[in-house]
Amino acid sequence: MPVSLVIDNRQKQVEIEQKLIMLLEKAVITSLAYEGWDPDYEVSLSFVSNKEIQNLNRTYRGKDYATDVLSFPLVDDTDGFPMGEEKLLGDVVISVEKAVEQAKEYQHSFEREMGFLMVHSLFHLMGYDHLEETEAQEMRKREEIVLTEMGLVRE
């Protein structure tokens, strides 16, 4: 069974088109394939406003500001297999408002920014982090490989 992307659009600032959903599904498939993971996972993806992601960031991370993406893994870090019987990889929450801001700031397309945020979040769901510089470099390298494979190169 292919990857399942469960979408919850809770923002009204930007219309989420089917083309974008397909791109984000491709991000999931490509990221999992790059890591050699089975593609049979379900990922929950919520599109939210800056206000909502700030509330989530405060609640779950103790940081009182709007961030671009939050990742909530449902995979057991010790063995890489999902906890429970269902193959739920985790939840991704993207501030679409922040993605628009960052696309302008970095002077690339909204689609490239959303693709990057999805890939970045997926690597978190698969157990990667960027707390240490070496971890950050490794994660960034993997993200760039996946984004390049998807055709989402820096403009």
UniProtKB/Swiss-Prot annotation:
Keywords: Cytoplasm, Endonuclease, Hydrolase, Metal-binding, Nuclease, Ribosome biogenesis, rRNA processing, Zinc. Its EC number is 3.1.-.-. One of its GO terms (molecular function) is zinc ion binding. It is an enzyme of class 3 (hydrolase). The keyword Cytoplasm applies. It is found in: Cytoplasm. Zn(2+) binds at H120, H124, H130. Binds 1 zinc ion. It holds the Pfam family YbeY. InterPro entries: MetalPrtase_cat_dom_sf_prd, YbeY. SUPFAM superfamilies: Metalloproteases ('zincins'), catalytic domain. Its main location: cytoplasm. One of its GO terms (cellular component) is cytoplasm. The keyword Cytoplasm applies. One of its GO terms (biological process) is rRNA processing. Its cofactor is Zn(2+). Belongs to the endoribonuclease YbeY family. Single strand-specific metallo-endoribonuclease involved in late-stage 70S ribosome quality control and in maturation of the 3' terminus of the 16S rRNA. This is Endoribonuclease YbeY. It comes from Alkaliphilus metalliredigens (strain QYMF). The gene is ybeY.
